[in-house]
Design a protein with these regions (language model features):
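Short, Lys/Arg-enriched, disordered terminal segments
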Residues: 1-4, 247-249
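ABC family nucleotide-binding domain
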Residues: 4-219
Length: 249
């Protein structure tokens, strides 16, 4: 059975004017991402990965080339059209969680559904609860953001990304603010989502993350320099189990 293409970039270029100088941030990027893949996009500072993230997230459009998200051409869309598409098709997860402070987990997770007139308040609430249970926070439904650890807040952010049942989960340095143990706990969750058939793109500067994904794309100077399938995916659960437990009181 032919795999569904969720994301397709065709010779995408993005140029910016900085003063009198034109900067070529993306220089003809092309690739396809298929349903159910867990892809890391890596690159050092200045590689173009942040610009690419903005393209993938429909926050910006190419100077030339085509970006097709779940069958929808993005480049010629208006800003408002892209906002609607983004809310329906993409679940964002950020390094700094982007949660509303002093707001409960359920209320934070409900947010992406607030603008969907097809979803009733009761359904919105239930879907938020289901998403939080799916990330292991069934006992933290009504805790506020300022009452939770960094790992718990990132789980809320992941639940918020899942609640719309998006075509793709787009994570930007999603373990960047977490300690080693908590980072592995979040990677375990990403691997579980991948095993359940979710399409995940994880943008990072940390090459170790690539060990836990199914495919790795490397950027340098605005170009794809490698795009490889990972035939030896490491288990984040095993990595977590190998971390010594701190027994200090």
């Amino acid at each position: 059975m032919k795999k569904k293409v969720v994301i397709e970039l065709q010779n995408v270029r993005r140029n910016f004017m900085v003063g009198d100088e034109e900067v070529h941030a993306l220089r003809g990027v092309s690739f396809k991402i298929y349903e159910g893949e867990f892809v890391t996009i890596m690159g050092k500072s200045g590689s173009g990965k942040s610009t690419l993230l903005n393209q993938l997230g429909c926050l910006d459009t190419p100077s030339s080339g085509e970006y097709i998200l779940d069958g929808v051409p993005v480049r010629t869309m208006s800003k408002s059209q892209r906002a609607v598409l983004r809310n329906r098709k993409i679940g964002f997860i950020f390094q700094n969680y982007n949660l509303l402070s002093k707001t409960t987990s359920v209320e934070n997770v409900e947010l992406p559904l607030m603008y969907n007139s097809e979803v009733s308040a009761a359904e919105r609430h239930q879907r938020a609860i289901d998403a939080l249970k799916a990330v292991g926070l069934g006992d933290r439904l009504y805790h506020k953001s300022n009452q939770m650890s960094g790992g718990q807040m990132q789980r809320v952010a992941i639940a918020r990304a899942l609640v719309n049942n998006p075509a793709v989960i787009l994570a930007d340095e999603a373990t960047g603010n977490l300690d080693t143990r908590t980072s592995f706990e979040i990677l375990v969750l990403f691997q579980k989502l991948h095993a359940a058939g979710r399409t995940i793109i994880f943008v990072t500067h940390n090459p170790d993350i690539a060990n836990y994904s199914s495919r790795n794309i490397m950027l340098r100077d605005g170009k794809v320099i490698s795009d490889e399938i990972n035939n030896n995916i490491q288990s984040a659960a095993e990595g977590l189990a190998a971390i010594p437990v701190n027994t200090d009181e």
